[in-house]
A protein has these predicted regions:
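Glycan-recognition and catalytic cores of secretory/periplasmic carbohydrate-active enzymes
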Residues: 1-200
Length: 200
């Protein structure tokens, strides 16, 4: 976690996909974004992994540096000028044909699950508000499958690796997983908020 914190992230809070290290010295040999538009671009699912991963690092270690990195990544993603109004990101924030690029539900589901986890550790309402908006979008007919359709997956329009032509605009099991995890975390947050309001 510390090595990734040191070498994967850019000053603006975004991250590379892959960092190649010298096996003998541990020094960085190269940085790239294999599944993104370019090495210096911000691949959407990679940004979601960064937010999710460092929120979970904080959960288990309580080291503030991890939460701060998750927050920096959140700010990059949620204030990016190329983020659509429904908060479902294009497959890469720097893809050349925006707004005519694929919009993967998979990246959004990971983000939502992370944002709900973040609400446990921050009093700022923006994290839950953002997560709720993402889930509202994912639950719409634009992304949510009808029962019995889409091979019985919950979400449509995920993207695996666009540059490699793999899993393009298809359902993906991990998108459904993080969607369900986000729903569970949303439910927990809502129950806790209701309990606090009753106690008042």
């Amino acid at each position: 976690a510390d090595m990734t914190l040191k070498n994967h992230f850019r000053m603006d809070g975004s991250s590379y996909h892959v960092v190649d290290y010298d096996m003998r010295t541990g020094k960085v040999r190269s940085r790239c974004t294999a599944q993104g538009y370019s090495d210096e671009s911000a691949w959407a699912r990679g940004q979601a992994w960064g937010i999710y991963g460092y929120t979970m690092c904080y959960r288990y270690t309580r080291q503030l540096k991890y939460l701060e990195q998750a927050e920096a990544a959140y700010e990059f993603v949620c204030t990016h000028p190329n983020l659509p109004e429904d908060l479902i990101p294009y497959w890469d924030f720097d893809a050349v044909n925006i707004p005519h690029e694929l919009i993967p539900s998979s990246a959004a589901a990971i983000k939502a699950a992370a944002f709900y986890e973040f609400t446990i550790y921050s009093k700022k309402p923006k994290y839950k508000e953002t997560a709720d908006k993402v889930m509202h979008s994912l639950s719409s007919s634009d992304y949510r499958s009808k029962i019995g359709e889409n091979h019985n997956f919950l979400l449509m329009h995920s993207v695996g690796s666009y540059p490699h032509g793999n899993e393009i605009d298809v359902p993906l099991i991990y998108a459904d997983y993080y969607f369900l995890e986000a729903l569970k975390r949303k439910r927990d947050c809502d129950i806790e908020a209701k309990s606090k309001s009753v106690q008042k």
